[in-house]
Amino acid sequence: MASKQPAILNPTPEDISLLLAAQTHIGTKNCEKAMLPYVHKRRADGIHLINIGKTWEKLVFAARVLAAVENPADICVISSRTYGHRAVHKFAANTGATAIAGRFTPGSFTNYITRSFKEPRVIVVTDPRVDHQAIRESAYVNIPVIALCDTDAPLRHVDIAIPGNNKGRHSIGLLWWLLCREFLRLRGIVPRTPNGWNVMVDMFFYRDPEEIEREQAEAALAKQAAAANAMQESTIEQVDFAIEGAGAGGVNPSVAANLPAGGEQVDWSADAAQDWAADTGAAPAASSWD
């Protein structure tokens, strides 16, 4: 791969494998004229394939521009696309940049009266089509724009275009992860070794909130079930029904004395020996009502 950048900045086979696995090279059926230099070829089904070598060159170039900014807080990373929300937050957490995820408030770069007013040195957007408001305002106030651009992305007011698939969640997360890693390497924060940065690329991938809630609910139920089982095992006592000693299988002597001799059966239907309704001859009790 012919490149004008230093050999130390060349991609490793692992980096190329990640880009291909995340389908970063898969474009769209539409292709802007300005994006033609970044297209490798067009497939039979009409899908344009992006040159991975160009993607890496522009990625390193963008990282060198960001590393030149003295204060990382002056870098504003923006993503109105849902798949890029987590990626920009992770990028900001690892670099100290300012993240804007979700709807971009109009006037954030031009109207100083708004609460969200910012004056960044450079901005990085996920998709020029979706983040067009931020790009337009940056053009008004002369803020350089770095953008992840698919084959159908308009490059108007975009200063540095990083060609790549900006519609898949894996591709978006990987591009932001590579940009963050290269930024930290150029800053000297992490070494340029295969295991120099211990943050996995999965941390930059978008996750469905419902999936996260489902996993948390399942974990809570499993924890409650484990606690209930532990409590039940600790409270159950083993009862010994075996009776040992002289009294085992014996009969109470006082009860046996009242039983009829000779094994006669007791007639429980016989009349009682005493008439409970008979007059006992006792004088009636005196009453105070008389």
Swiss-Prot record:
Record Pfam families: 40S_SA_C, Ribosomal_S2
Compartment(s) of residence: Cytoplasm
Residue ranges of coiled coil: none
PROSITE patterns, per database record: RIBOSOMAL_S2_1, RIBOSOMAL_S2_2
Protein name: Small ribosomal subunit protein uS2
Role of this protein: Required for the assembly and/or stability of the 40S ribosomal subunit. Required for the processing of the 20S rRNA-precursor to mature 18S rRNA in a late step of the maturation of 40S ribosomal subunits.
Any one GO molecular function term: structural constituent of ribosome
UniProt-annotated stretches for the region Disordered: 268-290
Species: Malassezia globosa (strain ATCC MYA-4612 / CBS 7966) (Dandruff-associated fungus)
Subunit structure: Component of the small ribosomal subunit. Mature ribosomes consist of a small (40S) and a large (60S) subunit. The 40S subunit contains about 33 different proteins and 1 molecule of RNA (18S). The 60S subunit contains about 49 different proteins and 3 molecules of RNA (25S, 5.8S and 5S). Interacts with RPS21.
Any one of the GO CC terms: cytosolic small ribosomal subunit
HAMAP family in the cross-refs: Ribosomal_S2_euk (MF_03015)
